[in-house]
Amino acid sequence: MAFDMEEQFSEECVDSGIHEECGVFGAYDFDGNDIASTVYYGLFALQHRGQESCGIAVSDTNGPKKNIQVHKGMGLVNEVFSSENLEKLKGNISVGHVRYSTAGSSTRENAQPLVLNYYKGTLALAHNGNLVNALELREELEKTGAIFQTTIDSEVIAYHVAKERISSATAEEAVLAAMRKLKGAYSLIVMSPRKLIGARDPFGFRPLCIGKRDNTYFLTSETVSYTHLTLPTKL
């Protein structure tokens, strides 16, 4: 499953105007178990938002509660994914990400989605945007013993969601509680083994769209990723 990309943007072509970095795409299919392929095409449509790294995490809502699988790497979507590794990502709920680094170095460790195993289970997170208080939140967590594996804002968010989930009745409540601590412009998708949750900053600076086709729901940074799937869109 590869695409010929004959024309690439030259490094000399610099966009000096307002633009977005990173793209997120999530999908929940109530009927099938091949959602990774759908997310692959969604990320391909969002490739212009990030060319450094990409990844897809999937879960089977009918499987074990800690069954989130992830595949990610450096490069374009068609370079990181093949038919073989997509075939291994079986499930009906998924979140994907394409990255253009604005915080944190361009390394595989910083590729998303991030997947965390914590006291109450497992979660995956894909994030677009920046936090102005990321360093402050990171230092607070480190003082309590948290050990970070990346240098990106997204891991700070994931830690706070996991921390709030321990004392929250639902994953949705945990995301809302974590958001109260975040300052900045962001949109994010959080996936538990059973749920797909979308959120953005209170001012809506970073886009997040929702769509539906048949029994599949979608969350994404841009409606361009809906076009190739012929989805109805809602903003």
Task: Give the positions of each predicted feature.
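A short, hydrophobic C-terminal helix/tail in secreted or cell-surface proteins
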Residues: 230-235
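Conserved short alpha-helical segments that host acidic/polar catalytic motifs at enzyme active sites
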Residues: 2-229
